[in-house]
Design a protein with these regions (language model features):
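Extended, low-complexity, intrinsically disordered C-terminal regulatory tails
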Residues: 18-51
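Short coil-to-beta-strand
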Residues: 1-2
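Catalytic cores and adjacent binding grooves of peptidoglycan-active enzymes
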Residues: 5, 10-18, 49-58, 64-114
């Protein structure tokens, strides 16, 4: 199951883009196969860095939580590997376990740097 629930406020998606709909589809596939709920915590909402792709509807943040709360780190590791393998190469970035991304996984579609 996919759940849309912001950490500080509601999740807002201004103009769903095909590139990110594919990410949501892959999240749903992982969720069904792993038997977990993937929570999308941010799309085009609250504050992000000035050049963030969240504002262009080309990025999302998500997490998988343990039953009692807290991030399910090993499941998040599996999710990061799954997305890296299943999203087409070239423009998708999966950011996990880097500074600022220790509690959520960030996925963006960014061809600017290539």
């Amino acid at each position: 199951m996919i759940e849309f629930k912001g950490l500080r406020e509601g999740v807002r998606w201004v103009h769903p883009r095909d590139e990110m709909l594919l990410v949501v589809k892959r999240l749903a596939e992982f969720s069904a196969r792993a038997g977990v709920t993937v929570r999308i915590t941010s799309l085009n909402d609250h504050s992000h860095s000035k050049r963030s792709l969240h504002y262009e509807d080309l990025a999302l943040d998500c997490q998988v939580l343990k039953r009692g709360g807290g991030v399910a780190m090993s499941t998040m590791d599996r999710l990061a590997r799954y997305l890296t393998a299943e999203l087409p190469g070239g423009c998708y970035d999966v950011v996990w376990r880097t500074p600022g991304h220790e509690r959520h996984l960030h996925v963006e579609f960014d061809c600017r740097q290539r």
